Design a protein with these regions (language model features):
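Short, loop-centered acidic/histidine patches that primarily coordinate divalent metals
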Residues: 163-167
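Outer-membrane beta-barrel "beta-signal"
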Residues: 152, 184-203
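Short glycine/proline- and aromatic-enriched beta-strand/turn motifs that initiate or cap beta-hairpins
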Residues: 21-88, 197-203
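Gram-negative (and chloroplast) outer-membrane scaffold detector with strong preference
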Residues: 61-162, 198
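Short sequence motifs at beta-strands and strand-loop junctions characteristic
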Residues: 40, 51-54, 95-100, 136-143, ...
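Outer-membrane beta-barrel porins/channels
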Residues: 170-179
């Protein structure tokens, strides 16, 4: 009789432990499923500067996040977007400036939650057009600068990331015969990116 009671007690204890472990696993899985978007250990994301498509161009970027750090590779073509209007110090009303297909490298750090401060290096090729003659010439510029933006997640995967970029570059001039074009040393440009988090690993 005592052996039978002892056996039943052992079974009850083992069953309770099993259910306790199952509940613990369920709690952990639930916590993971409700974790914040900025709490990931690592993630792979793809995104696009969607306004470029509205002007007949395109933009694609793929990024990898580790803890607070983020690296992105991008390619941009601005179509008919006139980037000369973004020039701060010496933009010219006599010329237009268009983004031709250009690559870029971005390195960022999350200051707080999804607020990202980043720097970049973009090997831009601009097509410069003189308005009065329609003559077009290419200008190559290695641009750097700073950006600040915030990822607003819609659910677990999709996000909208508005921000502001400050582009810096050295002096460059093109001779159009009747006039010289000097590219602005500083561009100030708002940006709006749409993205998808393809994969993530929780902390």
């Amino acid at each position: 009789m005592k052996k039978g009671i002892s056996f039943i007690v052992c079974i009850a204890i083992a069953t309770a432990n099993m259910y306790g472990q199952t509940d613990s696993l369920q709690v952990k899985e639930l916590a993971k499923s409700h974790s914040k978007s900025y709490e990931v250990k690592s993630a792979i994301e793809v995104e696009s500067l969607v306004p470029m498509f509205l002007t007949g161009g395109y933009h694609f970027a793929v990024g990898y996040r580790y803890e607070r750090f983020r690296v992105r590779l991008s390619v941009i073509n601005g179509g008919s977007y006139d980037a000369e209007t973004a020039g701060v110090n010496n933009s010219s009303a006599d010329f237009k400036r268009f983004y031709k297909t250009s690559p870029g490298l971005f390195l960022g750090y999350n200051l707080w939650r999804n607020l990202e401060l980043y720097s970049y290096l973009e090997a831009h090729t601009f097509e410069i057009e003189q308005k009065s003659t329609g003559i077009q010439k290419d200008l190559h510029s290695l641009d750097t600068g700073l950006g600040l933006s915030y990822q607003f997640f819609i659910g677990r995967y999709f996000y909208v990331q508005p921000g502001m970029h400050v582009y810096l570059r050295s002096d460059k001039t093109i001779d159009f015969g009747t006039a010289n074009y000097s590219i602005p040393n500083v561009d100030l440009s708002p940006v709006l990116r749409l993205g998808v988090r393809l994969w993530s690993q929780q902390k």
